[in-house]
């Protein structure tokens, strides 16, 4: 028990001392997120072309490991940023979580977990590679979501924008625990009843994020929040696209199907 306790204390101290430095911290240069997004799209289109006349791969074992990895990683990020936000609340007050108190607000514990969240977006690109190799349908929403999140999360750190970043890290990680658990169960061939609730939760995430950022816009000047406007504008713009795209996906996947079934029942 002492070993575990000492490890946790040492790890907490390490995260408390975390510092994001543009051009110094690994993958902190703008070249990495933007080039990755372009390469990601090209690779997916290339894989689809290569697999066009081939049989889709099974990849069951790899998919199981991949989903388990992301369940563990997502749970760790959710727990980590929740603890970091709580510690900041104790040290600086709740208002520090909705209005940056300095130009270096995404540092220390909370900065560490937002950085891990940023890195996780690179790993999540493997989701699409698996779909392409399996010859599964890949919708625009999926590609746009994965492509956009790498540069968006990089900008949070680069511009030291705290408000939307810690909240998105917390809520998105929670949703991804459920989502990758669902993917794991479907890979194992087990039924999973809550698929549509994951999409609902994602829409709620974007709505709450948009509301939080909109509040930040209102108080930014009067409260002298120490962060630039650009990451907030980008995040709310991306959130608006996500709300529309996820809303359409939910309607097409669930509402339109239920209405078609109702019509069939009436005919019968």
From Swiss-Prot:
Gene Ontology terms describing biological process: fatty acid elongation, monounsaturated fatty acid; fatty acid elongation, polyunsaturated fatty acid; fatty acid elongation, saturated fatty acid; sphingolipid biosynthetic process; very long-chain fatty acid biosynthetic process
Subcellular location(s) of the protein: Membrane
Entry's induction text: By STATa.
GO molecular-function terms, A-Z: fatty acid elongase activity
Membrane topology, as annotated: Multi-pass membrane protein
UniProt keyword annotation of Lipid biosynthesis present: yes
Alphabetical list of InterPro entries matching this protein: ELO_fam
GO terms under cellular component: endoplasmic reticulum membrane
Functional description taken from the UniProt entry: Could be implicated in synthesis of very long chain fatty acids.
Similarity remark: Belongs to the ELO family.
Protein name: Fatty acid elongase sre1
Organism the protein comes from: Dictyostelium discoideum (Social amoeba)
The gene coding this protein: sre1
């Amino acid at each position: 028990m002492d070993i575990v306790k000492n490890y946790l204390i040492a790890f907490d101290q390490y995260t408390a001392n975390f510092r994001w430095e543009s051009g110094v911290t690994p993958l902190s240069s703008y070249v990495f997120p933007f080039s990755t997004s372009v390469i990601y799209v090209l690779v997916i289109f290339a894989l689809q072309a290569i697999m066009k006349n081939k049989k889709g791969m099974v990849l069951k074992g790899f998919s199981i490991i991949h989903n388990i990895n992301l369940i563990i990683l997502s749970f760790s990020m959710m727990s980590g940023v929740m603890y970091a936000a709580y510690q900041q609340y104790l040290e600086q007050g709740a208002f520090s979580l909705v209005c940056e108190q300095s130009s270096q607000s995404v540092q220390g514990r909370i900065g560490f977990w937002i950085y891990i969240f940023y890195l996780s977006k690179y790993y999540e690109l493997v989701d699409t590679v698996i779909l392409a190799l399996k010859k599964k349908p890949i919708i625009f929403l999926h590609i746009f979501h994965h492509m956009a999140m790498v540069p968006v999360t990089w900008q949070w750190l680069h511009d030291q924008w705290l408000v939307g970043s810690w909240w998105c890290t917390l809520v998105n990680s929670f949703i991804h625990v459920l989502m990758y658990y669902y993917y794991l169960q479907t890979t194992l061939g087990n039924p999973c009843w809550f698929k549509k609730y994951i999409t609902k939760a994602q829409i709620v995430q974007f709505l709450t994020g948009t509301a939080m950022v909109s509040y930040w816009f209102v108080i930014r000047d009067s409260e002298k929040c120490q962060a630039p406007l650009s990451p907030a504008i980008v995040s709310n713009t991306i959130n608006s696209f996500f709300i529309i795209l996820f809303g359409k996906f939910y309607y097409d996947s669930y509402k339109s199907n239920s209405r078609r079934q109702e019509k069939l029942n009436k005919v019968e």
